[in-house]
């Protein structure tokens, strides 16, 4: 093999081929846009494998396997060039690729209110659902306690909502009272009240059809 390469480089005649050496199987080479296309001979067969086990006596020998594909495509020179500006393209791994895809059931944002087990309709044959082997009370206890714990975790949520609504109502009442007190203690309201009192005191006591009559003269001078 090395003698063939040296003969190609130095233009020396090729040495005589050995019968044991496999013959060349490349019949044509063509380079198109940086791609090297090689055509193989149709009569090329794969060499026998010395380490393969012989076929059993009852089976016929396998047919010689021809190479299915006779075209080999090599990458263009831009991927194999060497140099500071001609080096092969290096792909950098993104750190986000290492993140695991989280299943919705395993999410950390799931609260206790969403985990509620709905009891289905009772089975017509409850004894058939149990296994044949007898289980102790200690083994059956966790299966019965688990849905109860989940229901207890979901129960406080409505009570908390009611408490929040009551607290909101109390805050609204307090704000209304504060606004009323500020309105009564404001300077404008006090001035209006004082003016109303003064206007009432200035009014005469007798109004309407009352006629004032002068008194008789006592002295004649």
UniProtKB/Swiss-Prot annotation:
A single GO molecular function term of this UniProt record: ubiquitin binding
One Gene Ontology cellular component annotation held by this UniProt entry: cytosol
Localization terms from the record: Cytoplasm, Cytosol; Nucleus; Nucleus, PML body; Cytoplasmic vesicle, Autophagosome
Annotated keywords: Activator, Autophagy, Cytoplasm, Cytoplasmic vesicle, Nucleus, Phosphoprotein, Transcription, Transcription regulation
Biased composition (Pro residues): 47-64
Region of interest (Disordered), residue spans: 41-68, 177-210
Source organism, top-level taxon: Eukaryota
One GO BP: positive regulation of DNA-templated transcription
Residue positions where Phosphoserine is found in the record: 136
Segments carrying motif LIR: 26-41
Record-linked InterPro entries: TP53INP
Family annotation (Pfam families): DOR (PF14839)
PANTHER family: DIABETES AND OBESITY REGULATED, ISOFORM G (PTHR31671), TUMOR PROTEIN P53-INDUCIBLE NUCLEAR PROTEIN 2 (PTHR31671:SF2)
Complex formation: Interacts with VMP1, GABARAP, GABARAPL1, GABARAPL2, MAP1LC3A, MAP1LC3B, MAP1LC3C and THRA.
Domain notes: The LC3 interacting region (LIR) motif mediates interaction with GABARAP, GABARAPL1, GABARAPL2, MAP1LC3A, MAP1LC3B and MAP1LC3C.
Function comment: Dual regulator of transcription and autophagy. Positively regulates autophagy and is required for autophagosome formation and processing. May act as a scaffold protein that recruits MAP1LC3A, GABARAP and GABARAPL2 and brings them to the autophagosome membrane by interacting with VMP1 where, in cooperation with the BECN1-PI3-kinase class III complex, they trigger autophagosome development. Acts as a transcriptional activator of THRA.
Protein name: Tumor protein p53-inducible nuclear protein 2
Native species: Mus musculus
Source species taxonomy: Eukaryota, Metazoa, Chordata, Craniata, Vertebrata
Gene encoding the protein: Tp53inp2
């Amino acid at each position: 093999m090395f003698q063939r390469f040296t003969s190609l480089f130095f233009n020396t005649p090729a040495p005589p081929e050995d019968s044991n050496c496999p013959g060349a199987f490349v019949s044509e080479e063509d380079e198109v846009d940086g791609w090297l296309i090689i055509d193989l001979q149709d009569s090329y067969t794969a060499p026998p494998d010395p380490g393969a086990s012989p076929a059993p006596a009852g089976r016929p020998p396998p047919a010689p396997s021809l190479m299915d594909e006779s075209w080999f495509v090599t990458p263009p020179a831009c991927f194999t060039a060497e140099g500071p500006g001609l080096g092969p393209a290096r792909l950098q791994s993104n750190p986000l690729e290492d993140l695991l895809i989280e299943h919705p059931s395993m999410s950390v944002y799931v609260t206790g209110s969403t985990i509620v087990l709905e009891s289905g309709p009772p089975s017509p044959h409850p004894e058939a659902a149990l296994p044949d082997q007898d289980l102790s009370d200690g083994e059956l206890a966790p299966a019965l306690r688990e849905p109860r714990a989940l229901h207890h975790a979901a129960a406080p949520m409505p009570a908390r909502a009611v408490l929040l609504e009551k607290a909101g109502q109390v805050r609204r009442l307090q704000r209304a009272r504060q606004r009323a007190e500020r309105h009564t203690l404001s300077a404008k309201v006090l001035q209006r009240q004082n003016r109303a009192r003064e206007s009432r005191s200035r009014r005469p006591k007798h109004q309407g059809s009352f006629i004032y009559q002068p008194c008789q003269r006592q002295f004649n001078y």
